[in-house]
């Protein structure tokens, strides 16, 4: 009887290994497509689904493993925590988990599509229905310029924060939130503070918007937790 050879060994060369949990048919298809389109160096630097390329760990795999998701989501609901822990390599990395947004694409999928379309630094990606800015975050991580547009002001806020937060200065953020009581009082006012409305280039605006998004996330969670199903989802 002929010895059985696992599918992965049939598809990929020796010392190439997929990221744990890559088992859906569409994921295998995208991983193989990346493998066929990208060079070995590009696979190491850009691949969404490969863990090892000729024995070398990919940037995506190493980046995801740098995060302590248990600590990041220690105050999240059980469902949210499990969602991002299970999606460590697909949904829970970088700034994608800053605000839960239903209906968004898996970031890992978007990264693979950018690779398959051979979009590289120097190109510009346009996303006319940006939602939670998944495309812009992935483009940013790959060194690609992007333009995101959405009719929703909230999606605009979310997208700005998720891209800004990729390289924010932690000490500056800490200095803004150190007086949390005063900041919360400003956020709870009916009139939005001026620094959220200014159109001028203000370096601190991104930090204030980051705090605002965190506040809205916390308020939303508190509201959902203290309300009945009928109130949250009226028929």
Per-region residue spans from a language model:
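Short acidic, glycine/Ser/Thr-rich loop/turn "cap" segments at secondary-structure junctions
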Residues: 92-96, 138-140, 195-196
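Alpha-helix N-cap/helix-initiation motif
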Residues: 99, 128-129, 148
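Glycine-rich SAM-binding Motif I of class I
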Residues: 133-137
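Class I S-adenosyl-L-methionine-dependent methyltransferase module
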Residues: 141, 145-148, 152-235
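Conserved class I S-adenosyl-L-methionine
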Residues: 121-131
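S-adenosyl-L-methionine
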Residues: 1-119
